[in-house]
Amino acid sequence: MNGAESLIRAAVGAGVDVCFANPGTTEMPLVAALDSVEGMRAVLALFEGVCTGAADGYARMTGKPAMTLLHLGPGLANGLANLHNARRANSPIVNVIGDQATWHRAADAPLTSDIVSLASPMSGWVRETKSPGALAGDMADAIAASLTPPGKVATLIVPSDCQWDPAGDAAKPRAVPPRAKVAGGTVDNIAKVLRAKQPTTILLGGHALSLAGLKSAARVAAISGCKLMTETFTARIERGAGIPNPMRLPYFPEQALEALKGTQKLILAGAKSPVAFFGYQGLPSSLVPEGCAVET
């Protein structure tokens, strides 16, 4: 078994079974492994941004990571815009980026670049494989990193000689820490805020926009009389007949400020404190009304 096969086996063993790929010469051993190792479905895309965008959408809808396979630094660069979106949405993605053979890097061939520097701004985890024997373990670590709450983009850089050289057995899946629970004291504090009957808005985001989250928020609003709103742009929100459909916070700051006008307590449930998307003349960065207390 070579390094490429050990990587794909590690991925399949950890439950990653879809790869959105736009490969080149430095990824050919991995392309062969996609064919020889059962359990991984390869989807060819003709542009790297399609690979990263598809992986982002897949993660948002399934809650599990897909693998991307991209060609060197320029190929990664072509997919960075959608990795930015994925990072903002906390989407679990595992990028596998082929690189020059370790002994060929010094030649400074035309497509050689600093892949770590390109990957780092859009990734929550970056590693460069150093040997064929480390490849399976590195892949298992990348998958676990991508799934670590709240989810992140993990990028693994794989030199071509580490792919084609012999490797050891596939690595076992790593343990992934569970999502942290809200402390009991925080729940008690929010309950006190709601019982105070001051003008209160709950701003929903993240997992609060699941079916269970929306229904729970609607029950809280019905009992307390608070207003429900969602972030302007959500990673995912459940929709359908009978599902609560809170108002979205408007995009433009004037409208957002008007929507939150009069709110004295703003409770953030999976959401960030709202800010304007750009700096506008004469308007604030923060959309929290003046004098409003933010509770988390």
PLM feature segments, named:
Residues 1-296:
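N-terminal alpha/beta PP-like core and its mobile active-site loop of ThDP/TPP-dependent enzymes
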